[in-house]
Swiss-Prot record:
Role noted for this protein: Functions as an E3 ubiquitin ligase.
KW Coiled coil (keyword) present: yes
SMART domains the UniProt entry points to: ARM (SM00185), Ubox (SM00504)
Region (Disordered), start-end ranges: 424-448
Enzyme Commission (EC) number: 2.3.2.27
Coiled coil: 146-217
Annotated Pfam families: Arm, PUB2_N, U-box
Gene name linked to the record: PUB3
Lineage per the UniProt record: Eukaryota, Viridiplantae, Streptophyta, Embryophyta, Tracheophyta
UniProt protein name: U-box domain-containing protein 3
InterPro entries: ARM-like, ARM-type_fold, Armadillo, RING-Ubox_PUB, Ubox_domain, Znf_RING/FYVE/PHD
Gene Ontology terms describing biological process: protein ubiquitination
Domain U-box, chain residue ranges per copy: 237-311
Gene Ontology molecular function, alphabetical: ubiquitin-protein transferase activity
Length: 760
């Protein structure tokens, strides 16, 4: 009996580990959780390999367990792809811990089944390895989880055990990194948005979990109001009742909402501008969104400031000068108050260094570079601002002048696989050495891979216990890849695939010892399993920066295209993922783009592949579209037709599709194709109902259409674009607001020009 479910699970685990290697999540709770998932999967994977090699028997119960874990691993991969620092930290950690629990439960179930099955196996070492896996999986426990802290905090809140409750809440605040009042406000808004999404999904379990998390955020806000004191002058703290229940800052302009609660105007306006229609404190639905000034509270605050001889000027606190207290709000700038609560002080001091280089409030590192005319397609080079996300390995590039250079939109795109991201998997260890109780170690040595390349020359040498292969064994594997026996070649490709999943050294070592060329020849194999092992091994090797150029130089493009056209679903997916990984390098983008067959094969997969295949194809095409000349090639391959179809929210590909369309809209052929394929209505719908990233890129496409064609501008207006653009100009991301405002301004200019023409 062919263990298909086991093979599927192994493939899913390999893809997940590869994705982890390509990500740079800097948010410690999620990074720890992902690391522990990797450890559990690495414990189980060798046993599954033995099942495939028929060293351990299998049965239907095992297949059922593998299918369950396969589903969980795919959920974990989806989470990793979709998570962003813009989303709720609380939800992210909670979801990640739920997935970790499922991985442990499913792994333990499979291990126990394997233990029973291995009793009948003649290989005693199999029994020992399975027993060790069961023992380590059973004993695994992640300390100080959010779920554990949350359960204690909420339970103690109900029991009114305030001292213990405070301790748990402070631990949660520290875990989530809610350093400032603005961090808390942002988290409150994102959690409420998650509640709206869970209501739309109509899942009772999701709604129950969401309500618990909202209750937790309420507890945190109340806790901070009671325990975190803000000093406006030495020894003078702001009373809690003068502070906004939403942001916990001093209410500079107190207003009353429909529920009767008072908030600071700036904070509650941010809440309402994000489309949230419930009271942040009472959870009542707001019957209207009018903000009524609370002159009583405002006068009380002014009186309190005057009594304490305090004047709050921008970025400073000094003696009150006897001026008009009613003008208080106009004189108050950003609240530069001293936080006197000890645990908050430790939080701020520990984070100031890492945050000091960031732009205030956006979570991006900013770097200005010069982009040449070859990228922009113009006679002059222009300065672009590169914003690099501090977590899921995404890059976000855009030009201030859309007419000068095409937009490089934000998708799940890794500009390069750094040594730090590769080392997130850690060095390869034998299962007997791994302890799932340890957090995943991450190397910060940026020269790690280059030093590895110098160390592993093609001469016989001994190795330490890290799991790196010997050169003699590598050479033997390379010779096996050239063998006349299909069975020997398949086994060698499978072993290289396995050895390159986790080890940086093995990737470098195998690449330098000549495995790439024979692996490429196996991509033409008529044996689908051989082809799949070979293309996945190449995908793993391509993670290494040192291998990327080498793989393309020895002629990888044509064989990878062959797999895209002839392989099974998994081989096609991994071939597209390989092209995505290789296209991180500019020189590779140009070479791949010059092969029209490669672009056409990726477009075919985008249109007719599996869901995973479509996502990998979209990612690869996005990378290729960064190079200007490739934009027209992608359009000519009929990609726009499929991308417009993928704007359907039910297909769960909107963000990737609209990001690629944003790049393609920079060329005339792309704009014509978008309109011809009926993209305008779906783009307007994305501006209205899409994610923040989707709205941003959809607005960028519409802007390109309108700036370059009055006819297209009329079509956009006919689709009712103005209301969602007005909303986006007030509540979107900074870049989305800019795009929306540019569009609205363009519409006004067009209208004024028509009116002038009519009068004349």
């Amino acid at each position: 009996m062919d263990p298909v479910p086991v093979r599927c699970l192994l493939n899913s685990i390999s893809r997940y580990l590869h994705l982890v290697a390509c990500q740079t999540i800097r948010f410690n709770p999620i990074q720890t959780c992902i690391g522990n998932m990797v450890l559990l999967l690495k414990l189980l994977k060798p046993l599954l390999d033995e099942v495939v090699d028929c060293k351990i028997p299998s049965d239907d119960c095992l297949y059922k367990g593998c299918e369950d874990l396969d589903s969980v691993v795919n959920q974990a991969r989806e989470f990793l792809e979709d998570w962003s620092p813009k989303l709720s930290k609380l939800f992210g950690v909670f979801q990640c811990e739920v997935l970790l629990g499922k991985v442990q439960t499913c792994s333990l179930e499979i291990s126990r089944i394997l233990l029973q099955l291995s009793q009948s196996s003649p290989v005693t070492s199999s029994v020992q390895s399975v027993e060790r896996c069961v023992q380590e999986t059973e004993s695994f426990k992640q300390e100080g989880t959010l779920m554990e802290l949350m359960e204690n905090a909420l339970r103690n809140q109900k029991d009114d055990i305030t001292s213990l409750d405070n301790n748990h809440l402070e631990s949660i605040i520290q875990m989530l990194g809610l350093i400032s009042n603005q961090d808390l406000l942002k988290e409150s808004i994102t959690v409420e948005k998650e509640r709206i999404r869970s209501q739309a999904s109509k899942s009772e379990e999701d709604m129950e979990q969401t309500e618990q998390l909202i209750e937790l955020v309420l507890c945190i806000r109340e806790h901070m109001l009671k325990t975190e004191f803000l000093e406006v002058a030495k020894g003078i703290s702001i009373p809690p009742y003068f502070r906004c229940p939403l942001s916990t800052e001093l209410m500079l302009d107190p207003v009353i909402v429909a529920s009767g609660q008072t908030f600071d105007r700036t904070s509650i306006k941010k809440w309402l501008d994000n489309g949230l229609a419930v009271c942040p404190r009472t959870r009542q639905v707001l019957t209207h969104q009018e903000l009524i000034p609370n002159y009583t509270v405002k006068a009380m605050i002014a009186s309190w400031l005057e009594a304490n001889r305090i004047n709050l000027a921008t970025n400073s606190c000094h003696q009150y000068d006897g001026g008009d207290a009613s003008s208080m709000a106009n004189n108050m700038g950003s609240q530069d108050f001293n936080r006197t609560e000890s645990f908050r002080f430790s939080l701020r001091s520990s984070s100031l260094t890492s945050r000091s280089s960031l732009e205030t409030g956006n979570g991006f590192e900013k770097l200005k570079i010069n982009v040449s005319a070859s990228l922009c397609g113009e006679s002059q080079s222009k300065d672009l601002e590169i914003f690099e996300l501090l977590s899921p390995g995404q890059s976000y590039t855009h030009s201030r002048s859309e007419s000068v250079c095409s937009v490089v939109s934000s998708v799940d795109y890794v500009p390069s696989v750094t040594h730090e991201t590769e080392s997130i998997l850690g060095n390869h260890q034998s299962s007997s050495e791994m302890s799932p109780k340890k957090n995943l170690e991450s190397s910060n040595n940026v020269n790690h891979e280059h030093s590895a390349a110098k160390t592993y020359e093609c001469s016989v040498h001994d190795l330490d216990d890290s799991g790196t292969m010997t050169t003699s064994h590598t050479i033997k594997l390379v010779e096996d890849l050239k063998s006349g026996s299909n069975k020997v070649k398949t086994a060698a490709a499978a072993e290289i695939r396995h050895l390159t999943i986790n080890s940086i050294e093995n990737r470098v070592h195998i690449g330098r010892c000549g495995a790439i060329t024979p692996l490429l020849s196996l991509l033409y194999s008529e044996e689908k399993l051989t082809q799949e092992h070979a293309v996945t091994a190449l995908l793993n090797l391509s993670i290494s920066e040192l291998n990327k150029a080498m793989i393309v130089e020895v002629g990888a493009i044509e064989p990878l295209v062959h797999v895209l056209n002839t392989g099974n679903d998994r081989a096609k997916e991994n071939s597209a993922a390989s092209l995505f990984s290789l296209s991180v390098l500019q020189v590779n983008r140009e070479r791949i783009g010059q092969s029209n067959a490669a672009i056409q094969a990726l477009v075919n997969l985008l249109g007719k592949g599996t869901f995973r295949g479509k996502k990998d194809a979209a990612s690869a095409l996005f990378n290729l579209s960064i190079t200007h000349d490739n934009k027209a090639r992608i359009v000519q391959a009929k990609a726009v037709k499929y991308l417009v179809e993928l704007l359907d929210p039910d297909l769960e590909m909107v963000d990737k599709a609209v990001a690629l369309l944003a790049n393609l809209s920079a060329v005339g052929e792309g704009r014509q194709a978008i309109v011809r394929e009926g993209g305008i209505p779906l783009l307007v719908e994305t501006v209205d109902l899409g994610s923040q990233r989707g709205k941003e890129n959809a607005a960028s496409v519409l802007l390109q259409l309108c700036l370059n064609s009055p006819k297209f501008c009329t079509l956009v207006l006919q689709e009712g674009a103005i209301p969602p653009l007005v909303a986006l100009s007030q509540s979107g991301t900074q870049r989305a607001k800019e795009k929306a405002q540019q569009l609205l301004s363009h519409f006004r200019n067009q209208r004024d020009a028509r009116m002038k023409k009519g009068r004349s």
